[in-house]
Structure formats: C-alpha cells, structure tokens
C-alpha cells in the first residue's frame, strides 16, 4: 500500500521543478495501434504513392490481359498452320495416288492389248 501511495505522489508531483529548470518531457512508448487515425486525409506524397501503385497494378493487369489475348491468337494461328499443312500433305498424297493409279491403269491396258494381240494370232 505504501508503494502504491508513493507512485501516486510521484505522478502528482511531476510538474515544474523547484529550481525552475525545464526538463525533457517524459515520452511514452510508441503504440502504433493507437496512432492509426481512421478517415484521415492523405498527404500529397501519400496520394502520389497510392496513385503510382494503382497505375502499376493497372498496367500489370493490362499486360496480363494482352499476353493472354496474344497467347490465344497464337494458338489459333498455330492450329490454322497445322490444318493447312495437313491439307497440303493430303492433297500431295491424293495427287500421288492419282498418278500411281493412272500408271497402274496404263500397265493393265498394255497387258490387255498384249493379251488381245496374242489371242488374235
């Protein structure tokens, strides 16, 4: 109890010293939670910083969207190229098959002519 009363006296006594000399103000520890002021107006630097951050985020979003769009476009172009190459290859095979078929038909005709000529003798 005596300790408690001594502390109360120290708290009450603090004021201007008897000598009149001014001492440094006794500071309390910084408590960040108490310092936060809601709805306070931002300084010009904080506004600039916030705007810069928003611009940067916006640019990143735009860049990501552009990359996504470009990737989709590249995929479509690649599919188109593959389709055209496949079609060209198929046409080449068809031309070869037609040519081979014609050669085979010619061979058969020659054989038939030969056989016919042999039969007529």
From Swiss-Prot:
Family designation: Belongs to the CGR1 family.
Function recorded in the entry: Involved in nucleolar integrity and required for processing of the pre-rRNA for the 60S ribosome subunit.
Keyword rRNA processing recorded: yes
GO BP annotations listed: rRNA processing
Residues forming coiled coils: 48-104
Subcellular location(s) of the protein: Nucleus, Nucleolus
Keyword terms of this UniProt record: Coiled coil, Nucleus, Ribosome biogenesis, rRNA processing
Protein name as it appears in the record: rRNA-processing protein CGR1
Top-level lineage group: Eukaryota
Keyword Coiled coil: yes
GO cellular component, one term: nucleolus
Main subcellular location: nucleus
Species in which this protein is naturally found: Kluyveromyces lactis (strain ATCC 8585 / CBS 2359 / DSM 70799 / NBRC 1267 / NRRL Y-1140 / WM37) (Yeast)
InterPro entries found in the cross-reference section: Cgr1-like
Gene that this polypeptide is encoded by: CGR1
